[in-house]
Amino acid sequence: MGKKRIYELAKEINVSSKQIIAKAEEKGFPVKNHMSTLGENEERQLRAAFKPQAKTSHEQSAASAQPQRKVQQPRREKSQGTARTQTTAQKPAGKPANQTQRNNNNKNNGQTGNRQHEQQHSGTGRFGGSLNNNTNNSNGRRNSNNSNSRGGRNSRNNRNNRRRNNNNNNRYKKNQRIKDTNQHKGAPERKNKALPEVLVYTDGMNAQDLAKILHRSSAEIVKKLFMLGVMVNQNQSLDKDTIEILADDYGIQAQEKVEVDVTDIDKFFDAEMANKDFEAPRAPVVTIMGHVDHGKTTLLDHLRHSHITDGEAGGITQAIGAYQVHYNDKVITFLDTPGHAAFTEMRARGAEITDITVLVVAADDGVMPQTIEAIHHAKAAGTPIIVAVNKIDKPGANPNHVMEQLTEYELIPEDWGGDTIFVEISAKFGKNIDELLDMILLQSDVLELKANPKQNGVGSVIEARLDQGKGSVATLLVQQGTLHVGDPIVVGNTFGRVRTMVNERGRRIKDATPSTPVEITGLNDVPEAGDRFVVFDDEKTARAAGEERAKEALVKERRNTSHVTLDNLFDSLKEGEMKEVDVIIKADVQGSVEALAGSLKKIDVSGVRVNIIHSAVGAINESDVTLAEASDAIIIGFNVRPTPQARAQADSDKVDIRLHNVIYNAIDEIETAMKGLLEPTYEEEIIGEVEVKDIFHASKVGTIVGGMVTEGYVTSESDVRLIRDGVVIYEGKLGSLKRFKDDVKQVKMGYELGLTIENYNDVKVGDVIEAYVMKEVPVK
């Protein structure tokens, strides 16, 4: 607790501050005035010194209060005695009557005077305490009318004044006792409230805010700050140092409250994912990828014992599906993707939800373009690949040829000395499916996949749609924690409360553990595939976070992430953001692809290497742009052009495409960009033309051209080209540009002007002066 001041101690023990100061000086305490502070030992000694005195003063106050209550009792007795006195006082009334009979002229007046004297003496007996007969007789002998009437009025006035004064005194004393009692009872309550052990504050608090936390009045906080040398009012903001000094003066600790940005759900997601407490093994999440019609959906159909192929248009998967398969008392979660766009979009948003990739390759068709793309997608995501060679039941199946083809993409079978698992299957007849599941579980054991189910659920969106009957429907994959029905949730830029939760078989469930795909309802809007979701403790916080994220997204309009280009490549390398440059190569023939790839791999600048993530023959298509956008790569086209759709998508996603027809130019461009030597390209833009109307000669200036702007405009900083009969005679800069006698910066079409060409005078009437500027454009 803080040190107590003298005036505070004086109030508590009910003595004056001067007495405490005098006693403190006797004991040798260093005090100066009533604001001086006392230590605990000094306070204890002074309390002991004034303890008997405080008791005596209390007894005196109690004793002084008793006579005030006894004063009222004699009044009641005297009032009774007054009544008796009035009855006895009626007997001598006849004496004044006899006197008035002897004085016939003053008969009536004498009776009035005697009656008034009776009232006066009765009043005197009532308030004075006793009656005197001699006084009554002497007053009764007065025969003057004026004196008798005046004496009656005075007696009534005196009696009323005394009654009024007594009532006022009694009322004042009663109110004073009530006030003293209330002060005695209410004063210690506020002072006895304990201070908090720690003052949790935020920068910018005022005295009122601190008073509520410290259980003190605002005036006390302002006074204490004043004694500490800080002059503020109760509404003025305080900085961190002042608040900490105040807390130190009170003898408590100060701790600044850390404000958490609830809109940054990625921070909550990472924190939940990093929680290693209560970890337990979880099911692996497996993505099935491959070329169209190679049997991806048929394989998954056999795994989950349902037939979805017949219900889909043309046998092609129309939406992402997530299903769980139970095998050998273990669970495997499978994701079936419609092509690779959704997988890439999820990876582009940072949703690394896949643990293992199963690459399905038909034994009769071999490696196809989408197979190669699937390999590059999986490698870019950093997931291990298990190759399922399908359709081995067909007559033309050649699994060995598939293995030979995949060795070109660094997928070497274990039998051949590599580390890639190959399984020959027949999805149609279910051959070797169990062996494939065994290999998946074996790979998951190697990865040691674990998660904490005893926390709030977090995960990613697999797919989302708007249902007419249900509203927003989202398929979620729980990656950490447990998701319950009724949980307040934020999904991307949407929010809500989990109203219903359905598993892949259409059954309602109440909770979902890690690696479990579920379909939920209750969101206010439709999220996007790859968005993360986080469960909050209360719906109010979830709503605030979701609304703020939606507002930010609306303002920024889903601003595109700036990807690496050759123009900013050197800056990215210099800032240490990149250790390698990802490149996609597309060429007209395979020989050009191999030559360009080999030359680019030999470039070595400051320890940064070129990483070719995809190379193929053919035009640059949308799939190439999607892969480049997800991998932050540069596309190099050799003797090929992008399709219109790919060009539009590249412009939208800010993907850099470089086109060349000379292989060494492509190599030099990449190398110079990595070294920071790539110079900008300039483009000429003609802004105006001037027709020469007249020529003037000045000895100090030279040839002055008088003309008119026939097209565009001319600026004083323009470069000019003198054209005579369609032939360029001279190129240079303007020396000066005037209109009448004033120097101007610009002259527009239809206006006359005067100009000079720097270091050139051979200008003739009828010549055309062309004005142009050089603009910097990025190299494409």
From Swiss-Prot:
Region described as G4: 390-393
Highest taxon, organism lineage: Bacteria
Biased composition (Polar residues): 59-71, 80-90
Binding site for GTP: 290-297, 336-340, 390-393
Biased composition (Basic residues): 159-176
Region annotated G5, chain positions: 426-428
Subcellular location: Cytoplasm
Chain positions covered by the region annotation G3: 336-339
Sequence segments annotated as region (Disordered): 24-194
Any one of the GO CC terms: cytosol
Positions of the tr-type G domain: 281-450
Bias-annotated ranges (Basic and acidic residues): 177-194
Cross-referenced NCBIfam families: IF-2, small_GTP
Biological role: One of the essential components for the initiation of protein synthesis. Protects formylmethionyl-tRNA from spontaneous hydrolysis and promotes its binding to the 30S ribosomal subunits. Also involved in the hydrolysis of GTP during the formation of the 70S ribosomal complex.
Family: Belongs to the TRAFAC class translation factor GTPase superfamily. Classic translation factor GTPase family. IF-2 subfamily.
Protein name: Translation initiation factor IF-2
